């Protein structure tokens, strides 16, 4: 079952924000497929002692949030202060949550497309970007569902800033890579996913990775409860296929 870790974010601006991140979304659990260069770039930015910026885009469900969670986990394990701002949940907080984040080691802004056209949020992100440039110490990772110039932002200067750094498209996984990703997730959870069962899932289910991972978790729980190994007949029974 998925569990969560809490990361405390503290800044000199007296902001205290608890971050709850899934503890299984790390670099070790990310199957790169054709994204090896992207993964290397992310890890290089995290290793360096000065600021760095990467913009990562892909359709929803491709693994954008996984990589940001992994980056937060890696630096927080080193004792560094990190900030993760999921803009698809922006109703939970206000733009002022970004105040003081230039003092953190890492800031991750997820799903920036969700605030396109929102003047307050766009200005808050633009101001944070400029403060990070001035500080020269904070790493900034931003994700969106399209390249910066296609975000339909109301603030042209923000679109220009987002277009400055390293920009990567997260490439979708092939079916073979999806099978490897499923088997990796299974191994990390302490069980084996037979190849024939994995190929059956890819053939019969929606191939979006989030759906596949949720199904794998369901099958893991069912297998433990029934004390049965994962076989195609058992999978058919559980999923009613």
From Swiss-Prot:
It comes from the Bacteria. InterPro entries: Chromosome_initiator_DnaA-like, DnaA_dom, Hda, Hda_Enterobact, Hda_lid, P-loop_NTPase. GO terms for biological process: DNA replication initiation; negative regulation of DNA-templated DNA replication initiation. Keywords: DNA replication, DNA replication inhibitor. Coiled coil: none annotated. Pfam families: Bac_DnaA, Hda_lid. HAMAP family: Hda. Mediates the interaction of DNA replication initiator protein DnaA with DNA polymerase subunit beta sliding clamp (dnaN). Stimulates hydrolysis of ATP-DnaA to ADP-DnaA, rendering DnaA inactive for reinitiation, a process called regulatory inhibition of DnaA or RIDA. Belongs to the DnaA family. HdA subfamily. The active form seems to be an ADP-bound monomer. Forms the RIDA complex (regulatory inactivation of DnaA) of ATP-DnaA, ADP-Hda and the DNA-loaded beta sliding clamp (dnaN). NCBIfam families: DnaA_homol_Hda (TIGR03420), PRK08084.1 (NF005982). This is DnaA regulatory inactivator Hda. It comes from Salmonella arizonae (strain ATCC BAA-731 / CDC346-86 / RSK2980). The gene is hda.
């Amino acid at each position: 079952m998925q569990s969560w870790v809490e990361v405390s974010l503290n800044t000199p601006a007296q902001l205290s924000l608890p971050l709850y991140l899934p503890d299984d979304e790390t670099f070790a659990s990310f199957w790169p497929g054709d994204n090896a260069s992207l993964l290397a770039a992310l890890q290089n930015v995290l290793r360096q002692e000065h600021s760095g910026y990467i913009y990562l885009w892909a359709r929803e469900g491709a693994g954008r949030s996984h990589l940001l969670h992994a980056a937060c986990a890696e630096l927080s394990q080193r004792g560094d202060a990190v900030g993760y701002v999921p803009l698809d949940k922006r109703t939970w907080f206000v733009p002022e949550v970004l105040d003081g984040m230039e003092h953190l080691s890492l800031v991750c802004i997820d799903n920036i497309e969700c605030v396109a056209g929102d003047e307050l949020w766009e200005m808050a992100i633009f101001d944070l970007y400029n403060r990070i440039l001035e500080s020269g110490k904070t790493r900034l990772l931003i994700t969106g569902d399209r390249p910066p110039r296609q975000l339909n932002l109301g603030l042209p200067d923000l679109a220009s800033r987002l277009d400055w750094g390293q920009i990567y498209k997260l490439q979708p996984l092939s079916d073979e890579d999806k099978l490897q990703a499923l088997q990796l997730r299974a191994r990390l959870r302490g069980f084996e996913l037979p190849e024939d069962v994995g190929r059956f899932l890819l053939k019969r289910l929606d191939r979006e990775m989030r759906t596949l991972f949720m199904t794998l978790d369901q099958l893991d729980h069912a297998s433990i409860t029934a004390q049965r190994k994962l076989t195609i007949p058992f999978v058919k029974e559980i999923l009613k296929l």
